[in-house]
């Protein structure tokens, strides 16, 4: 029989191995910051990756995370705070969630194209220098059950609510994307 400590240790080793396998590259799009080559919890650009509540540094195990369990007005912007920023916690100090301003720069200065990669629809975002990242759709339509839009958290809280701002694109969003 395995002891609880052995089980915990083997789970920690598994998580460590998975992190090492799935470590994104930093892609220079010619903007003020570099962007990850794929999502947290993904293994390649077309993988959706893990779902997160805003300000929680580990993936959600309860399905679609819409609202954070923390008061956004209390903690403020979470960029780089490993207690709240999943990118910093999982990938290290050189990684963090983008701010509203950085997402706005991505929106304003890049070319956005609808693409299908490995059978997954999303947006190919090409920077001024010609490098690109792929953002797969991660939200399903209630009517069709198909993935039809992408919602990506920013580090910036939406003051006066229990949520944060996100970069949205696809169905029911202003083209090519919007911060909401």
Role assignments for model-derived ranges:
Residues 1-19:
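N-terminal Sec-dependent export signals
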């Amino acid at each position: 029989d395995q002891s609880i400590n052995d089980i915990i240790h083997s789970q920690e080793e598994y998580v460590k191995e998975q992190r090492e396998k799935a470590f994104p590259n930093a892609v220079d799009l010619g903007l003020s910051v570099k962007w990850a080559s794929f999502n947290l919890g993904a293994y390649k650009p077309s993988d959706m990756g893990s779902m997160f509540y805003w300000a929680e540094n580990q993936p959600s195990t309860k399905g679609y995370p819409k609202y954070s369990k923390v008061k956004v007005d209390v903690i403020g912007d979470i960029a780089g705070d490993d207690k709240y920023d999943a990118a910093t916690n999982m990938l290290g100090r050189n990684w963090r969630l983008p701010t509203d301003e950085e997402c706005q720069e991505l929106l304003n200065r890049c070319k956005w194209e609808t693409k299908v990669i490995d059978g997954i629809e999303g947006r190919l975002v090409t920077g001024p220098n010609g490098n690109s990242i792929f953002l797969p759709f991660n939200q399903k339509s209630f009517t069709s059950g198909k993935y039809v839009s992408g919602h990506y958290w920013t580090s910036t809280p939406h003051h006066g609510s229990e949520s944060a701002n996100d970069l949205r694109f696809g169905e029911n969003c202003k083209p090519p994307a919007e911060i909401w």
